[in-house]
Every structure is written in structure tokens, then in C-alpha cells.
């Protein structure tokens, strides 16, 4: 955001350009999603370590889901952030170029999307993780979120 507020192109700040604002939102939304899911997963971990079986089952489905989504989105977010910064985002004096490289490594280290999908299926079939996820989502979402009366 600092770059968008301060960098001037064609006589206007980047943040004042409608297409740039749209791109910023496309950076911010998945970032906030990953942060929110990280907190939800951390809470499940705390409760699982305190002995909650439901939290342990929830943790089994949240962990691979978070790994998949956050590492996949990180590549796009970092690429868009580098683009937003322009050429200065590419040079090594700023973290953006390193973050982009690290984002690609994240999905490699955490396993391919197919392996992560198999882990989710294992959690559902063997550990009842879906039964733990459903009430968690119901508590977080409005009653009519899925068009039900």
C-alpha cells in the first residue's frame, strides 16, 4: 500500500488509478483469506493440544487446505505485488523478488496439489474431519449463506 500511495505515474498516484485499485484488491483479498484461515487453524491447534478430539479432526482438514490455498495464492499475490512496484520490485534491494521466489518454493515443499488433495480425502475418510468442519463453518456463516431458508 505504501508504494501505491506514494508512487506517481502519469502525474497521478497509483492508488488513484481505478485499474491499480482493482489489482490491489486482488492482492489484499487472498492475503486476508490466508491470514484468517491461519488464525482459525492456529485456534484448532491450541484446542487439539488441550485435548479436544473435534479440534484435532478439524485441524486435520484445515492444515492441508490452508497449505494448498495459501501457497497457491502466494504465487499470484507476489507476482501482482512485484508488478505493482514496477522495475523497482524486481531488484534485490527490496523483498518482493525474494518473496516471489519463496512463494514458488512453498507449493513445492508443501507437496503438489494432488498430494494435498489426497491428504484432505484421507482426513475426511479416516478421521471424520468433515464432521468437524461443518459445525465450524455453520457457526461462522449466516444461516442463509447457502440459499437455505
Question: Predicted regions: what is each one?
Answer:
Residues 1-149:
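Flavin-dependent oxidoreductase catalytic core characteristic
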